[in-house]
């Protein structure tokens, strides 16, 4: 498609101007509000008797490092399956996450760590910011290849605010348990992105259908993302939990759930595939559903068997979703879900929230002993019954779906503004429209455009 000189000039300026504006505004807010916390500040840490080994850095940084790798390597490479959108998948993941980390530090800080007029930052705030970035990248997966970088940054600007608000309502007001984010991260990110995709529906997307598939090497690169996510997911779910048995139990439950979801994915993929052959799309995504489904319940006394059962069910549901649900969403509901986030994050996230409610409802002093105070402090103090905690968990799911749906709708209306740069229907899933693409890839893209023009 040929762009007019005026449109090309405006398009060229939108991204740099928005990046500079967002970074400038964020920097000013950091200067005014953000300060080191006690364990990061030189004066505060050395005031009193502290051993360096007691600093939270040495307890939290290994988990943070794993979560950080998941955000930038895992999510980025998982989305490179599109044959001609590898630069956009990894590059825009990099851009969105870098902005979301700064913006969410401010938003989450105002809600959770605002003390004496300042936001205090340290290892915990870094981990929480990564979690927020994860939700943004899940939403990105639903509109991958169909939106420009300016639209994506504005999506992140809105979504981070709503993520922080939803998280505050769930964790601070309702006091639900959701350490691994089945609700706050996966369910919120998935349905925010799906509603956004519905509002941005493209009836002429068929013009770019030939680019929506994968090729051998793009699927292979996407498997790198899968393996990174699979390996580090126990750290993702356990990073914010209390040190000791809770963190240990969370990692263990996630570990077993992932193994079970992998086996069920291979089983179902071969069962529904042609001639019993495996589909790499299923393996890349549904094998990870085990990490999503135990996000809420992993720190609870789920039991190893419960973790296996949950993971197996999540892998099966996710695989069947890719095979049967995704086509229905597109044909009947007009939801164009590029990465299938409904199958990897949406349905397993909702299932995980329901599982968390069930396990919370079964909590007893006999099962948890003195550990009940760290997992369910309100039950331990007698302020809530186990049944009441379960109902709060389920209400948290309803609140999350409400925030995600309303937020996704508002985000879609914002991104539909005509002034915002967006790829035309015939150039979706194409790197060349936003990136300098060297070598053979560029020539192939040009040849494809010439063929379309002649047709």
UniProtKB/Swiss-Prot annotation:
GO terms for molecular function: ammonium channel activity; ankyrin binding; carbon dioxide transmembrane transporter activity. A motif (Basolateral sorting signal) lies at residues 429-432. Pfam families: Ammonium_transp. Residues 416-424 are annotated as: Interaction with ANK3. GO terms for cellular component: basolateral plasma membrane; plasma membrane; spectrin-associated cytoskeleton. Belongs to the ammonium transporter (TC 2.A.49) family. Rh subfamily. It comes from Bos taurus. SUPFAM superfamilies: Ammonium transporter. It comes from the Eukaryota. It is found in: Cell membrane; Basolateral cell membrane. Keywords: Ammonia transport, Cell membrane, Glycoprotein, Membrane, Transmembrane, Transmembrane helix, Transport. Residues 35-61, 108-124, 173-179, 241-253, 299, 365-393 are extracellular. GO terms for biological process: ammonium homeostasis; ammonium transmembrane transport; transepithelial ammonium transport. N-glycosylated. This is Ammonium transporter Rh type B.
